[in-house]
UniProtKB/Swiss-Prot annotation:
This is Macrolide export ATP-binding/permease protein MacB. Belongs to the ABC transporter superfamily. Macrolide exporter (TC 3.A.1.122) family. ATP binds at G43, A44, S45, G46, S47, G48, K49, S50. PANTHER family: MACROLIDE EXPORT ATP-BINDING_PERMEASE PROTEIN MACB, MEMBRANE COMPONENT OF TRANSPORTER-RELATED.
Amino acid sequence: MAGAPLIRLEDICKTFHNGDLAVEVLHGITLDIRAGEFVAIMGASGSGKSTLMNILGCLDTPTGGRYLLDGEDVSTLNADELATLRRRTFGFVFQSYNLIPTSTAQENVEVPAIYAGTPAAERRKRAAALLNALKLGDRLDHRPSQLSGGQQQRVSIARALMNGGRIILADEPTGALDSQSGEDVMELLRSMHQQGHTVIVITHAREVAERADRLIEIRDGQILSDTTKRDIHTPEATLQPHEEIAGNGAHIADISEAVKMALRALRANIFRTVLTLLGIIIGVSSVVTMLAIGTGAQNTILDRINAMGTDLILVRPAMAGFRGSGSIATLVPQDADAILELPNVKSAVPEVTGTVTLRRGNVDYQSQANGTVPAFSLSEIVESRQRQLHHPERYRYLRPCGWLGTTVVKTLFPDGSNPVGDYILIQKIPFQIIGTLEPKGAGFGGSDQDDVVVVPLSTGNLRLFGQKYVRSITVQVKDSSLIDTTQNQIQSLLDQRHKKRDTMITNMSSVREDAAAMGKTMTVFLGSVAAISLLVGGIGVMNIMLVSVTERTREIGVRMATGARRRDILLQFIIEALSVSAIGGAIGVILGLGAAALASWAGLSVGYSFGPVLLAFACAFATGLIFGFLPARKASRLLPAVALSSE
């Protein structure tokens, strides 16, 4: 017969290795098959016929020899080039049908066209037409489990024809069918041969083999006989390789199609998917909640510091190596007067504090007494409600008067009466209440700023505490940008006055910076603790994906047989992992925000911001990518023949 053969095998050998043991399955097979032939390769189990079919269909590569397909040396092609060749040239019909159980009949038929880059509308139309031609038009949306064996095999045949199927390789196509269904399948194969397809049937049954025009018998890896029963009829219009629409083809047409396949696979085992999602959901929601609470705590601390004023400088007595600064009697009211003369100083307020016993009627109560001067209100620490009673004259002498914080008022005046003008005993000394203080709530560190009684500085020093020195001087500056310079000037002034360094000076701006840094550290710590659960969720994703790869090995083989390249398989399984992580991340963000809102309702300070939410979702997405890569890579590295033979 004129013309070069479509398939030429020259001295093909195949050896399998099991440790140190080498088993040669094919021994120097030489064979020509021309375009349009209907060939049956017959042999008993273990004869090597399935191995020969795998090599013919580019599902496996020979150990030795040369395989020419349409004049091209197949043995020189890499894995992706072999995938392209399978997609453009071959259509496979398997004994066990090898349909994807999670897909409908129409979706199964569309698989080869997906990897060929055929537009969705066109491939759906062609798949429906093929199934209608095979009398399955009313079964388009049925899954394999809803079809009979004969119907499943017809779906398999339609899939083989989806990309043209220039060469049809049928492996035991009637082996799992009843006699009538088997007869129908053989008639379909004969019809495909008459339409110009090259049909190669692999079988162990002589009655099936004799339906072909040419019968090649193989035994123990060698061709035993090669006979032609009748003149080979080659159709005038021999089919050409399938022309792919998407350039080089062999890629998933778009990401949306890969996502659809991923979601379809995830729905197949919904319980396992939910368990996998839980790990990501818990991890992401923990990160969002912890960061929100941490940010809220940081903001609360900073707000309290801001309320105290960031333009304040605090001067306290202290000496290097001396513990207990409160007992150092070096800071005096005259130091405040000297500080007030500095250029950037707005006010300098000396203060003396100590614990005192208050009494009204039969109620005794211990509180904090604060002796200060009129400028005290300028420090913005407390304010008097009765400013008309806030006269400097009351500070200059040992006047027994004072202002009460709201906690003290509630304790000594539980009946709600107005304390102004009334008298109480402080350290057994009668004091007139001339005002109350604005409520301040908890201070920095959790102390109650309302548990205080304010008295004139001179009264506090001599009548209550019996001392002339002060505990601290609070300085308010005019220009906050010069606060560091002013702090240095105060330090130099006091060093000069005291002839030594016996004071400790801090400004609220630096305290705020330290508190902000501490808050950030705590937030990072909380986020890190929560991120551990996200890491555990990621390991769960990897574990489930590895199980999925093992369970779906045959599906991977089917996809590779129909033209999927390694990158297509890699992309599909990575997208499955990313889909789990993205869904879990979205649910986790919602639950995390809900948990944060619940914490806020319960009284905790919560700080919402877009950054932590985006970070948590991005971490979930990255977790899916990182932990999904290893299973995806494992899937993409499988050999088609090995994957198809898995149980």
